[in-house]
Amino acid sequence: IGDETYVTFASGGAFTKFSHEFQTICTAGEDVLYVNADRTVAVNEEVLDDATQELGVAKKTLSPVTTAEVGNIFKFGTEKSDKMHVVYKDAEGKQQPIYLASYGIGITRVMGVIVEKFSDEKGLVWPEAVAPFQVHLLSLGADEKATEIYETLTKAGIEVLYDDRDLSAGAKFAESDLLGIPCRIVVGKRSLESGKAEVKKRTEGDATEVAFDDLVSLFRK
């Protein structure tokens, strides 16, 4: 989401005049930013007048966009440490003030934005960099072989969500699409005959067959 996230001038609340928010373009977001054409300036609507004056930017050069906040920075300077009489000694033994700041990231907010931005009509489409698992392994009446593959993959350091429930293939496929793990491996009775598993990326429509012995190398980079 980095390419669609702005460092934004925003209200500092009770702490400072301004803060820096990290705002991601998201139609489900609750904030409105005003952004210039080359995306070098982004101002939260709540401080639009004060911030444009501070930055020397004309409001007419900014356009609104709906966003969701995923993180923030409050810079306190030395105000807080001065009140607490907190200092440090430098290399020359002189007392120096300590600069304080608060750096926050909203983990649940980030997840919500990912859900909004990386999904389709079937469900989630987790980006590989943040997916909770690399592989969704489905057993369709071939539990013994599927369990063997699960153990082989996990021993190789590959994160696997294993579904060995007694459900129909259609139900398992639908739930797999809903969860959106980057890659799905299906092991069924046909797999036992061919010695190959069915492998399908969540972002692609077609599946391919991969030999059991080649599955580990498929996920090693």
Regions found by a protein language model. Give the residues of each.
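NTP/phosphate- and nucleic-acid-binding module
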Residues: 1-221
